[in-house]
Amino acid sequence: EDGALKGTQTRVKDEPSKDGKSVITAHAAVYGLELPTKNSVVEVKMRFDGCTMMDVEFDDRKYTGSHYGHLSRAQVRLDKVTIMDEREGSQNEEIKAMKLDPTKKEEVAKRMAGTSATYPVKLKEGETYTVVVETVGDEMRVSIDGKGVAFLKSPGIGHETKSKIELGVAGQSGSFDEIKVWNAA
């Protein structure tokens, strides 16, 4: 829209299927770039137009140790930025299985420790921000309008092959513009 990539989440809550036998789950709107990287810099202009979250995500679809090959992501909300190592944390298949067993709650918490970090920010609806996500080895940094706002060092970030970069929008609409990606040495 107007030269920008607009994402709109069309289903914001889980709903029963028409036959009532299953549930259709809400999911963020996602645009994937088939762009292999290891160490990279992703720069994008983000604009919140009713959405609650926008993100830059790194995946490896051939990796089976995490759901859908999710590796890491930087989530930006109006009040916070969260960096997640999904390979070792929330999307790790072993951890997802352990979460189904209430007796494993302590073990899940132990394994999840250090796989995400959240930092406060103050952003405004309708404003455009330049967001830069840098991954080098097992470290990810996020800056907004030239100011460093978030950092995480965790093993999954250093995954050898990130075959896909995804841009996501949750909770209605948001826009990405001037998308730039550099592979770092």
Model-derived features: positions:
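Extracellular/lumenal ectodomain signal focusing on beta-strand-rich modules
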Residues: 2, 39, 151, 177-178
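Short, solvent-exposed beta-strand-to-loop segments that form ligand-recognition rims
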Residues: 138, 143-165
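Short tryptophan-centered beta-strand motifs in secreted/extracellular beta-sheet-rich domains
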Residues: 42-44, 126-144
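Secretory/extracellular carbohydrate-interaction modules
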Residues: 9-102
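Generic beta-strand structural signal
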Residues: 1, 76, 135-137
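Short, aromatic/His-centered strand-loop micro-motif at the edge of beta-sheets
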Residues: 90-132
